[in-house]
Regions:
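Short acidic N-proximal helix/loop "leader" segments that mark the beginning
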Residues: 39-76, 101-115, 122
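Intrinsically disordered terminal extensions flanking catalytic oxygenase cores
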Residues: 1-59, 282-387
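Active-site-proximal segments of catalytic enzyme domains
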Residues: 161-195, 219-225
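Catalytic micro-motifs at enzyme active sites that drive phosphoryl/nucleotidyl and oxygen chemistry
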Residues: 151-153, 195-200, 257
Length: 387
């Protein structure tokens, strides 16, 4: 494999004073033990309203890498943009409030999921238990920032995918042991088979914005590795607390690598799709079916897809009526092409809504991967025991 390129991190102002410390708590499912101390956030008022003038801390990324620069063909994706460098997005006050909401007992109790791709994820909680998080990602100013970087007008794909959390936590003792093991293996020239936070995958949705909720001052590693069109690897160094990365992750294989030197790595991922109903919606549910409340996921997926179809039909109906009033001949072939596209749209939608009794909770197959070697690697991994 070719040597990996790297993107240097962008350091945000005013975050050095907020450093979370670990504490112990009861395990939620016998595997994951939340040890994150969130006391700084808990001291805040319970009803903090998102205010973009206070809580946005945006500075444009120094560079945005195009799909072409990453080695992909012009027809891949819904935008020319591949991935941005890390950039400051939210203030320290915003991050504290987000941590307060997402690390609450109710979220851990009702919205924690795990799979063979990622050990600990929190999903679907924003409308009920995280109003600040919900409003932050629905705010027009936030959407304008993400859309400008992505090179296309975007909206959150659906409420269920607002504020998805990936978590890796360990005790101080575990942190020190991992550092010592990594140093020993490096000295002996061994290749360390690191367990990633989120294994190789493509996203189910066109774009994601990945926000760092942890202090990364002493963190080693923790990058997101992207597979380029020529199969080489580009490592995007993890953003600092309050910083984010915009990625067209539906079309690029990527992995969240393990971080050393820190007791936690918590990222928030919000997924986006094009606002325009006339643009393709390549959403799949491959990587999210097994880690979701399926009836809710299917309802929200159906709702927005049928809204897209409704808008397309209304637009086409207006077009043929206008042509009739203008005494233009009816274009049969144009309508047949439109109908075929909508048939394919509905067939794809039907395919993604797999019957609930055929979905294995916590297990995602390799159909989301693009590269044969990664598919083969995935097949060789032992299928986890579902508890």
């Amino acid at each position: 494999m070719a040597a990996a390129d790297t993107i240097a991190p962008t350091l945000p102002p005013a975050f050095s004073a907020y450093v979370p410390s670990p504490s112990s708590s009861k395990p939620q499912n016998g595997k994951i033990k939340p040890i994150v101390n969130n006391s700084d956030a808990v001291e805040q008022s319970g009803n903090v309203q998102f205010d973009p003038s206070v809580h946005l801390n945006f500075t444009a990324p120094s560079k945005v890498h195009t799909m072409k620069e990453l080695g992909y063909k012009d027809n891949v994706g819904v935008s020319p943009v591949g991935v941005s460098e890390p950039f400051p997005l939210f203030s320290v006050e915003a991050i504290k409030q987000m941590r307060k909401e997402v690390l609450s007992e109710n979220v851990w109790r009702h919205y924690k999921f795990s799979s063979n791709i990622a050990q600990c994820q929190l999903r679907g909680f924003a409308p009920e238990f995280a109003p600040f998080v919900y409003d932050a990602w629905k705010n027009p100013e936030t959407l304008a920032i993400v859309s400008k970087i992505a090179g296309i007008d975007l909206v959150p794909v659906m409420d269920w995918e607002i504020g998805h959390i990936n978590i890796s936590v360990q005790s101080e003792e575990q942190k020190n042991k991992a550092l010592a093991d990594a140093a020993r293996k490096a000295e002996e020239g061994e290749d360390e088979e690191q367990m990633p936070i989120v294994d190789w995958h493509t996203d189910s949705y066109p774009f994601v914005c990945v926000l760092m909720l942890s202090d990364c001052t002493n963190m080693i590693g923790g990058e997101t590795a992207l597979r380029k069109g020529d199969r080489s690897i580009l490592k995007v160094r993890g953003p600092q607390m309050g910083c984010a990365v915009v990625l067209q992750g539906r079309y690029i294989e990527h992995v969240a690598l393990r971080a050393l030197g820190s007791t936690e790595r918590i990222t928030m991922v919000t997924s986006f799709r094009p606002r325009s109903a006339t643009l393709p919606d390549d959403t799949v549910l491959t990587t999210v079916r097994a880690i979701s409340d399926l009836p809710e996921l299917y309802f929200q997926f159906s709702e927005y897809r049928l809204e897209i179809l409704e808008e397309r039909i209304r637009k086409k109906l207006k077009e043929i009526r206008d042509q009739k009033r203008a005494r233009r001949p009816f274009n049969t072939q144009s309508l047949k092409r439109f109908l075929l596209e909508q048939e394919q749209f509905l067939a794809h939608m039907n395919k993604e809504m797999v019957d609930e009794d055929k979905v294995t909770v916590g297990f995602t197959d390799d159909s989301h991967l693009l590269s044969e070697d990664l598919k083969e690697r995935s097949r060789k991994r032992a299928r986890p025991t579902i508890e």
